Amino acid sequence: MKNWTDVIGKEKEQPYFQHALQQVHLARANGKTIYPPQEEVFNAFKYTAFEDVKVVILGQDPYHGANQAHGLAFSVKPEVAIPPSLLNMYKELTQDISGFQMPSNGYLVKWAEQGVLLLNTVLTVERGMAHSHANLGWERFTDKVIAVLNEHREKLVFLLWGSHAQKKGQIIDRTRHLVLTAPHPSPLSAHRGFFGCHHFSKTNSYLESNGMKPIDWQI
């Protein structure tokens, strides 16, 4: 049984990774507000063990508003308003999954604990400045995460929404994993094919057909 340390532990010793950590540390030390809080940056890996991953949902960078980001892509803390992209994911779920009720919060830990890796491709952001940490080196790290999942695991489902996620997912072996693509669920693009994509039910059909327990998407 491999764990995250086995497959990506050495990345943390790489100069690029140390540089990313150092830049984030310096920004915080200089009084900048960086999201998520330091202890939550790697939450995606804490909530979903390597051997437990069944589904990978790729986000871009963390939410940059106060108290939103907590280290899981698309997820927000329970007391925070549900962001528009996640609201659209919930709307699709109400159409796609029989009996799904519109949740009152956007806290997706329940998904993560069932094996849904909610991975942002950039792990930090400065308050109010989307993509402000896009060039720190996080992309290289998350490319490695995708590569080790592709290589060491079988029959995963990758949900790639929007061109950024789809580009990141080009290395995935589609003969060994299910890759589902759609426009991003943001209000700008959801109507171009995210609504009606049925990715949540397709994910569960694939898991069940391969002898795995489906995801209970209800939050």
UniProtKB/Swiss-Prot annotation:
Any one Gene Ontology molecular-function term assigned to this protein's record: uracil DNA N-glycosylase activity
Enzyme class at the top of the EC tree: hydrolase
Keyword entries, A-Z: Cytoplasm, DNA damage, DNA repair, Hydrolase
Gene Ontology process terms (BP): base-excision repair, AP site formation via deaminated base removal
Active site: 61 (proton acceptor)
Any single Gene Ontology cellular-component annotation: cytoplasm
EC numbers: 3.2.2.27
Catalysed transformations (reactions): Hydrolyzes single-stranded DNA or mismatched double-stranded DNA and polynucleotides, releasing free uracil
InterPro entries in UniProt: UDG_fam1 (IPR002043), Ura-DNA_Glyclase_AS (IPR018085), Uracil-DNA_glycosylase-like (IPR005122), Uracil-DNA_glycosylase-like_sf (IPR036895)
Spans through the membrane: none
Keyword Membrane: no
A Pfam family assignment: UDG
Compartments where found: Cytoplasm
PANTHER family the UniProt entry points to: URACIL-DNA GLYCOSYLASE
Family: Belongs to the uracil-DNA glycosylase (UDG) superfamily. UNG family.
Role according to the record: Excises uracil residues from the DNA which can arise as a result of misincorporation of dUMP residues by DNA polymerase or due to deamination of cytosine.
Protein name: Uracil-DNA glycosylase
Chain's gene name: ung
